[in-house]
Amino acid sequence: MPILDTPYASLDLIRQPEQPNEPLQAFDAADEYLLATLHGQGLPAATRVLILNDSFGALACALAAHVEVTSSGDSHLAHLALQKNLARNDLPADRVRFVPASEAAQGPFDRVLIRVPKTLSLLEEQLIRLHDQLAPGAQVIAAAMIKHLPRAAGDLLEQYIGPVQASLAVKKARLLSATPVDKPAPQSPYPTRYQLDQPKLELLNHANLFCREGLDIGTRAFLPHLPKALGAIRVADLGCGNGVLGIVYALGNPQAELTLVDESYMAVQSARENWQVILGERPADIRAGDGLAEQPPGSLDLVLCNPPFHQQQVVGDFLAWRMFTQAKAALTKGGELWIVGNRHLGYHLKLKRLFGNAEQVAATPKFVVLRSIKA
């Protein structure tokens, strides 16, 4: 793997989830540009640094031995990458404090370093939280590859922080430096809510949720065809988002034992709050995790899944394939995986290869609902 050479450290970094013959590296030119700029400015050892959305820990690992670092983001996989990369580079784990994006970091901070996320509502929520977290003279710097830097990111920095200065481009990366000014305390528009018609439910969604303003069309295609199995079976909603699949299934099967898991901390927080409002004190295991990686083998009877096909800006079916293989391992003999996916992604071929069978349960012009049974 390529080495990240910075003025602070040379780092051997890996991505998460790990893939054989990984074609992508765990850092980019925006990380390099940001670290070089910080070094040029000077960074005293007493500097309190907050890093937001550090995908695989490149920024935190580079600075860990030099300043006080807090890292915050919405990805459990990013947190896992940070832990592994600290260990891989012989850096003490306690040099970096990690705070899930579902919680507020505790300032004040002298420098805030932001990797601009794909979802600008997440960036907006993070900037709103900075209102009372900045020390006098603090500086906020956002970094991105130019192809992933929308104009709206600069507008949000100016709206919530202060005047923005854009850097020159270096290796197709750009920095946006914002100078904090006094502003009235902003009101967050998050979480948002939408109404579900069948069944009639109101669902809450924190800032980084996919299809935050309404039910996504894949889930809409899946809900009428959820399995009708009843009784005390063990069911997982894999990649649960706001929990809608697991919650609707649980309403139809009062005896089922539910696990809802997602790698997004804000998704898990949304699912917990929705479960509490709709199902009250009914027990459920709702957690952030690397899919079903920590689920005991043979411990589930049914897995429901609407798999993602991107990780940040990277598009591919590697996450779906990983979820399918995890589901197979976690299912008991005769257990079933039910998924919904875009027709063009060809998930039926992957499921048939993995399980030896794949049945089309339902279809729309764009989506298919598929079922595979573990032999």
Swiss-Prot record:
Answer whether the UniProt record assigns the keyword Cytoplasm to this protein.
yes
What Enzyme Commission number(s) appear in the record? 2.1.1.174
Q: Where in the cell is it found?
A: Cytoplasm
SUPFAM superfamilies from the entry? S-adenosyl-L-methionine-dependent methyltransferases (SSF53335)
Protein keywords: Cytoplasm, Methyltransferase, rRNA processing, S-adenosyl-L-methionine, Transferase
Q: Which reaction does it catalyse?
A: guanosine(1835) in 23S rRNA + S-adenosyl-L-methionine = N(2)-methylguanosine(1835) in 23S rRNA + S-adenosyl-L-homocysteine + H(+)
Q: What GO MF annotations does this protein's record show?
A: 23S rRNA (guanine(1835)-N(2))-methyltransferase activity; nucleic acid binding
Give the primary localization class: cytoplasm
Cross-referenced CDD domains:
AdoMet_MTases (cd02440)
Q: Keyword Transport, does the record have it?
A: no
Give the CC-aspect GO terms. Answer: cytoplasm
Question: What role does it play?
Answer: Specifically methylates the guanine in position 1835 (m2G1835) of 23S rRNA.
Family as reported in the entry's similarity comment: Belongs to the methyltransferase superfamily. RlmG family.
What is the protein name given in its UniProt record?
Ribosomal RNA large subunit methyltransferase G
Organism from which the protein derives = Stutzerimonas stutzeri (strain A1501) (Pseudomonas stutzeri)
- What is the primary gene name for this protein? rlmG
